Amino acid sequence: MSDNKTSLSYKDAGVDIDAGNALVDRIKGVVKRTRRPEVMGGIGGFGALCELPTKYKQPVLVSGTDGVGTKLRLALDLNKHDTIGIDLVAMCVNDLIVQGGEPLFFLDYYATGKLDIDVAAQVVTGIGEGCIQAGCALIGGETAEMPGMYEGEDYDVAGFCVGVVEKEDIINGTKVAAGDALIAVGSSGPHSNGYSLIRKILEVSNADLTEELNGRTIADHLIEPTKIYIKSALKMIAEHDIHAISHITGGGFWENIPRVLPEGTKAVVDGKSWEWPAIFNWLQEKGNVDTYEMYRTFNCGVGLIVALPKEQAEQAVALLNAEGENAWVIGKVAAAEQGEEQVEIR
């Protein structure tokens, strides 16, 4: 072999192992702040260990995985990365609470073409904040530097969460019946859904993201992190007979509410029971979006819809509002004919 040939390294190929190690050192404090007593060991191992909480008699594991979609593009364009991790945690843990699950631990996957330690640390710090809000431990993750797969320093994130629920307390919608009340729990904005349409609206309307709407810029409204409902929802579940919970995500009202309704029932939603947050009216006007399409794409100000006996609705609303949520009675469950749509907005 010729001596004058250059010796190549992994770094020459675009993968900086030292940068990855530096990132791990930066985020150790974040991970420590999320720790739960069930977690065994620290980060850096091949796998993470977590015991089941001893308070459960027949524990059932609940799992979920999600991303934040094209809201990431907005974060990249705004160079604002400190809250996208909250979105990531929220999209996973809010799916767990639908079945009554208490989140136990969370793992993240961060992939990029070229690792920017500062940006990645901001993202993971946001993930840690989301885990604190949800009461779960950030126990591990993967940072993948993949030159040629992503443009420049663009990145993508995915999250994985595991929770636990008592077997006899699983919420699965089978108890939903005509006459149940429907409670809405307000959202913080578009959350992490509908951003491909949002970006199209911004493009065709040539919108100014620095424009102010109700004292905040359009950019601030759109990048607002997804609300995490875990602590207030767990308290509600503990004190009330919850029949179903729907997380209003991609597909809006039309797609998500029927997922928790048994055959022969429908949700009758009072469209006059709340005012859409201003950002949704702005999006509808700028994009000339039909109202049906708005309800099919966005949460329109509603993050969760809860079904429960009507005699418990008033107390549940009061509990949620005392916990800092914005909750109200949004409608009821009614009998549905065969083939009838399961969501009716009046």
Swiss-Prot record:
Domain of life, per lineage: Bacteria
Pathway annotation from the record: Purine metabolism; IMP biosynthesis via de novo pathway; 5-amino-1-(5-phospho-D-ribosyl)imidazole from N(2)-formyl-N(1)-(5-phospho-D-ribosyl)glycinamide: step 2/2
Listed GO biological process terms: 'de novo' IMP biosynthetic process; adenine biosynthetic process
Catalysed reactions, as listed in the record: 2-formamido-N(1)-(5-O-phospho-beta-D-ribosyl)acetamidine + ATP = 5-amino-1-(5-phospho-beta-D-ribosyl)imidazole + ADP + phosphate + H(+)
GO terms, molecular function: ATP binding; phosphoribosylamine-glycine ligase activity; phosphoribosylformylglycinamidine cyclo-ligase activity
UniProt KW keywords: ATP-binding, Cytoplasm, Ligase, Nucleotide-binding, Purine biosynthesis
EC number: 6.3.3.1
Listed InterPro entries: PurM-like_C_dom, PurM-like_C_sf, PurM-like_N, PurM-like_N_sf, PurM_cligase
Matches recorded under CDD domains: PurM (cd02196)
Keyword Cytoplasm: yes
GO cellular component term, pick one: cytosol
Subcellular locations according to the entry: Cytoplasm
PANTHER family documented for this protein: TRIFUNCTIONAL PURINE BIOSYNTHETIC PROTEIN ADENOSINE-3 (PTHR10520:SF12), TRIFUNCTIONAL PURINE BIOSYNTHETIC PROTEIN ADENOSINE-3-RELATED (PTHR10520)
Family: Belongs to the AIR synthase family.
HAMAP family, per the entry: AIRS
Name of this protein: Phosphoribosylformylglycinamidine cyclo-ligase
Gene symbol of the encoding locus: purM
